[in-house]
Amino acid sequence: MSLSGGRSSDRPIILERIRSAILATYIVFTHESTQDQQELDLYQDKVGATIAGHPLKVLAAYGPQEALEGDGPEGVVIVEFPSADAARAWYDSPAYQAIVQHRVKGGRFRAVLVEGV
């Protein structure tokens, strides 16, 4: 279906799909606390292999930080993807899902997908 044709009720869905496919999207991981360093070490050893074939760029990883409001996390990782679809493809990939258990067992984290503007 073309963007100029079809039912007008389809247009918001089509436009949202286009928007999702072209806007930079970020996954922000905040490491709130550590429960099991060995599990986190396993995750760290394996996460690099999950990147192959995925268009992503690590923008920040456990660098210096300053909490402007509230308590600061132990660490922050910000990963950029070319689209929300690309971000979900990596996060939902069998390779990443096979290791995410180590991060979850190793500490308290937040993972947030944020679309750019």
What is the meaning of each model-derived region?
Residues 13-75, 82-92, 115-117:
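Short S/T/G/P-rich N-terminal loop/turn motif that feeds into the first structured element of a domain
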Residues 2-7:
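Intrinsic, low-complexity polybasic segments
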Residues 88-112:
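C-terminal structural segments of small proteins and small subunits
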